[in-house]
Amino acid sequence: IVGGRPARPHAWPFMASLQRRGGHFCGATLIMGWGQLGTNRPLPSVLQELNVTVVTAGICFGDSGGPLVCNGL
C-alpha cells in the first residue's frame, strides 16, 4: 500500500497476510463465512475462534562447510 499507515491490531479482521520465509508476499481478504449479506441481520464480530499452536521452522540456505553425512554415509 502506497502512502498507507499502520493499522491497530484486529482493526481489519477480514484481512490476511500470506507469508513465506518469515516475510509478507501477498495480501488476502477473507470473504467466506459471513452469512447472508443481503439481509438486515448484523454481521458477526467473530467467525470462529480457534486456539492452535503454530510452529515456524528455520530453513537452511547454505552449507556449513562440513561434510554431508546421512545415516553414517
Curated annotation (Swiss-Prot):
**Keyword S-adenosyl-L-methionine attributed:** no
Q: What Enzyme Commission number(s) does the record list for this chain?
A: 3.4.21.-
Enzyme's top EC category? hydrolase
The UniProt keyword set, sorted, is: Hydrolase, Protease, Serine protease
One Pfam family name from the record?
Answer: Trypsin
Q: Name one GO molecular function term.
A: serine-type endopeptidase activity
Database matches in PROSITE patterns: TRYPSIN_SER
Is Glycoprotein there in the keyword field?
A: no
Where do the Peptidase S1 domain residues begin and end? 1-73
Q: Which residues form the active site?
A: S64
Biological process (GO) annotations held by this record are:
proteolysis
Per the similarity annotation, which family is this? Answer: Belongs to the peptidase S1 family. Elastase subfamily.
> What does this gene product do?
May be involved in the degradation of connective tissue in chronic lung disease.
The protein's name: Neutrophil elastase 2B
Q: Which organism is it from?
A: Equus caballus (Horse)
